[in-house]
C-alpha cells in the first residue's frame, strides 16, 4: 500500500515537472518570436519617414546598394514576385556581438501600396515556393499587412530575396483603384553600428572622449579594452571602454585629441534603399487594348485584300 502511494506521488511530480517545462518552453518561444526580426518594429510606427528615408538607416550608417525588381503591371487578385537583391562580397567577415568574426546576415523591409499584401500559402505555386526557400516573412504591424519584414537571415544563402505578393481587387476593396503605385524597399547586409536606444554596437569605430595622453591600456579578460586618458592641463582622467571586436589604433604614452579614432572601423556591411513602380491593370482595359489591336490587324488585312481586288479589276480592264 505504501509503495503504491509512493509511486502515485512520483507520477504526480513527474507530470507537474513536464507541465512546467512545457509552459516555460512556450513562454520563451513566444517572447523570442515577438522580438524577432527587426529592431525598427520596436521603435517606429512606420518604417518610412516623411522625408522618404527608411528608419533602418538610423542604425546601419554605411550606404550600400540594393536592387528591386517587380512586374511593370499586374492584374487584380494575382500573385507576383518582388525580387530584392542585396549584393556584397561573400568572402567578407563581420564582427559578431562576442567580438569574433563570422558571416554577414541580411534583412529587408518591403513597403507595398495599400491593399497589396503577402500572398497566402495556398496561392503560392510550387515554383515560387522553391524560389522563396525557407524564408519566413511577417507584417511590420498587425494592421500594416502591406509592409513586410524579413531577417536577419544568412547572406550567403539569401542575398536575393523573393517576396510572394498578392495584388488587391478593386471589386472587393473599394479604396483600391486601377493606378500606378510606388513600392519602396530597404535592405541591409551585416550588423548595425547603433542600437535603437542610441548606444554603439561593437561594429563601429570608437573615438576618444577627451584630449590628453594615453596613460594605460588594460586588456579585459573577456575581450575589449579600458583606455585611461589623462588631460595634461588639469590632470583629469577619463576611461574609454572599447568592446571586443574593433582593432586598437593607439598605444600607451601617445598624445591624442578629442574625437580622434581609438579603433579601426570593423564594419563591412551597410544599408541601402530603392523604389519601383507597378501598375494595377484593369482587365477590361487589357481586353479593350487587345480588341483594338485585333481591329487594326483586321483593317490592315481588309485593306490589302481590297487593294489586290482593285489591282485585279484594273488588270482585267486593261486586257479588255
Curated annotation (Swiss-Prot):
InterPro entries: Cyt-f_TM, Cyt_f, Cyt_f_lg_dom, Cyt_f_lg_dom_sf, Rudment_hybrid_motif
Keyword Chloroplast: yes
Any single biological process term in GO: photosynthesis
Membrane-crossing segments per the record: 286-306
Keyword Electron transport: yes
Membrane-topology descriptor: Single-pass membrane protein
Positions bound to heme: 36, 56, 59-60
Cofactor note: Binds 1 heme group covalently.
Localization: Plastid, Chloroplast thylakoid membrane
Homology family: Belongs to the cytochrome f family.
Matches recorded under HAMAP family: Cytb6_f_cytF
The protein's name: Cytochrome f
Source species: Saccharum officinarum (Sugarcane)
Lineage: Eukaryota, Viridiplantae, Streptophyta, Embryophyta, Tracheophyta
Protein's gene: petA
Amino acid at each position: 500500500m505504501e509503495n503504491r502511494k509512493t509511486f502515485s506521488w512520483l507520477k504526480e511530480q513527474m507530470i507537474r515537472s513536464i507541465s512546467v517545462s512545457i509552459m516555460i518552453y512556450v513562454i520563451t518561444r513566444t517572447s523570442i518570436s515577438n522580438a524577432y526580426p527587426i529592431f525598427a518594429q520596436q521603435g517606429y510606427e512606420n518604417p518610412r519617414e516623411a522625408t522618404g528615408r527608411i528608419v533602418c538607416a538610423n542604425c546601419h550608417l554605411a550606404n550600400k546598394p540594393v536592387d528591386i525588381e517587380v512586374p511593370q503591371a499586374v492584374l487584380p487578385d494575382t500573385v507576383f514576385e518582388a525580387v530584392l537583391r542585396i549584393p556584397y562580397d561573400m568572402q567578407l567577415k563581420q564582427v559578431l556581438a562576442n567580438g569574433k568574426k563570422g558571416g554577414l546576415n541580411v534583412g529587408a523591409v518591403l513597403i507595398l501600396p495599400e491593399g497589396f499584401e503577402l500572398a497566402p500559402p495556398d496561392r503560392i505555386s510550387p515554383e515560387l515556393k522553391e524560389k522563396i526557400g525557407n524564408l519566413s516573412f511577417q507584417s511590420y504591424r498587425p494592421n500594416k499587412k502591406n509592409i513586410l519584414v524579413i531577417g536577419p537571415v544568412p547572406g550567403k544563402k539569401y542575398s536575393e530575396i523573393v517576396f510572394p505578393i498578392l495584388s488587391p481587387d478593386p471589386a472587393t476593396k473599394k479604396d483600391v483603384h486601377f493606378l500606378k503605385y510606388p513600392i519602396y524597399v530597404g535592405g541591409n547586409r551585416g550588423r548595425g553600428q547603433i542600437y535603437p536606444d542610441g548606444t554603439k554596437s561593437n561594429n563601429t569605430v570608437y573615438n576618444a572622449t577627451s584630449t590628453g595622453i594615453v596613460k594605460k591600456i588594460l586588456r579585459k579578460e573577456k575581450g575589449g579594452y579600458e583606455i585611461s586618458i589623462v588631460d595634461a592641463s588639469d590632470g583629469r582622467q577619463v576611461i574609454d571602454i572599447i568592446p571586443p571586436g574593433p582593432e586598437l589604433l593607439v598605444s600607451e604614452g601617445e598624445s591624442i585629441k578629442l574625437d580622434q579614432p581609438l579603433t579601426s572601423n570593423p564594419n563591412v556591411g551597410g544599408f541601402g534603399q530603392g523604389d519601383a513602380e507597378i501598375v494595377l491593370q484593369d482587365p477590361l482595359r487589357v481586353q479593350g487594348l487587345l480588341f483594338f489591336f485585333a481591329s487594326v490587324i483586321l483593317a490592315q488585312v481588309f485593306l490589302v485584300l481590297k487593294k489586290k481586288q482593285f489591282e485585279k479589276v484594273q488588270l482585267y480592264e486593261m486586257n479588255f
